[in-house]
Swiss-Prot record:
The gene is Crem. One of its GO terms (cellular component) is nucleus. The lineage of its organism: Eukaryota, Metazoa, Chordata, Craniata, Vertebrata. GO terms for molecular function: DNA binding; DNA-binding transcription factor activity, RNA polymerase II-specific; DNA-binding transcription repressor activity, RNA polymerase II-specific; RNA polymerase II cis-regulatory region sequence-specific DNA binding; RNA polymerase II transcription regulatory region sequence-specific DNA binding; sequence-specific double-stranded DNA binding. Stimulated by phosphorylation. Phosphorylated on Ser-116 by TSSK4 in vitro. Ubiquitinated by CDC34 and RAD6B in order to be degraded by the proteasome. This is cAMP-responsive element modulator. It comes from Rattus norvegicus (Rat). Residues 299-357 form the bZIP domain.
Amino acid sequence: MSKCGRKKYMRTNVRQMTMETVESQQDRSVTHSVAEHSSAHMQTGQISVPTLAQVSVAGSGTGRGSPAVTLVQLPSGQTVQVQGVIQTPHPSVIQSPQIQTVQVATIAETDDSADSEVIDSHKRREILSRRPSYRKILNELSSDVPGIPKIEEEKSEEEGTPPNIATMAVPTSIYQTSTGQYIAIAQGGTIQISNPGSDGVQGLQALTMTNSGAPPPGATIVQYAAQSADGTQQFFVPGSQVVVQDEETDLAPSHMAAATGDMPTYQIRAPTTALPQGVVMAASPGSLHSPQQLAEEATRKRELRLMKNREAAKECRRRKKEYVKCLESRVAVLEVQNKKLIEELETLKDICSPKTD
């Protein structure tokens, strides 16, 4: 075997030895260094290498980024430190975000909590039902005043209707006067009144409210069909208070209706014209206006405004005409004066002209 062949054989053996060692220690940088060191040693004259070199890898541990150091033991017994050129990869600087695990635990409500909520709701309803209503407070306040009739509080639906009263369609508003009469006001404006002896609202009598164009604005005609023992009747109309009195009795201060809440007071006067029997005119302060009356009032105001505007326009035109006439007269006077001055000037010229000659 020639010298070149031996060198190639030694190089291949050393390369195989170094590659097996580096693969076991995860360092690929040792192969090139060992091969170069072995080739340099073969060039010195050592031809036969009967045994393989022992390679041991030791980490430097000096810190991050420092190359690894490999200890190579040659067959002659010498130990050589070989430093790897290829550096080990650094760990990633980017840190993965910390994921927090949240556990959601649902606590099922027990039957005891549901029962306690039901009991609380019942107690709350009882407390609200025990509160006095505004009708009860109004009756307590008006009990000392004899002129104010008491308003009975409407019974709840739970109490039910008495067995001796037949079920019927009751109007929206039911009132009871101080004489014990029931007064019902339907949605259409019909007033119904019942005597104290009748059962409940079965003996209601129909009363009609009509508006007439003959009375002054704000007056309301109330027609009733029945009378009480003393010849007078009292009932309430929603939004106002009306006291109806017979023609034969005189009007006394006690017959004045007392206002309760936001209900204004009205004074009843005996009719001065020939009205039918049982018809009384109630003079209101202007709060009882039907939609037709409101429309008529708006039309009347509009016509009055237009009439005032027409009168103002006529007056303005008249003043302008007078001013123009005054100016024309002044112009005429000035023209006459101008003519006179011209004539005087001519006469003066005639008088002065011979002297100049």
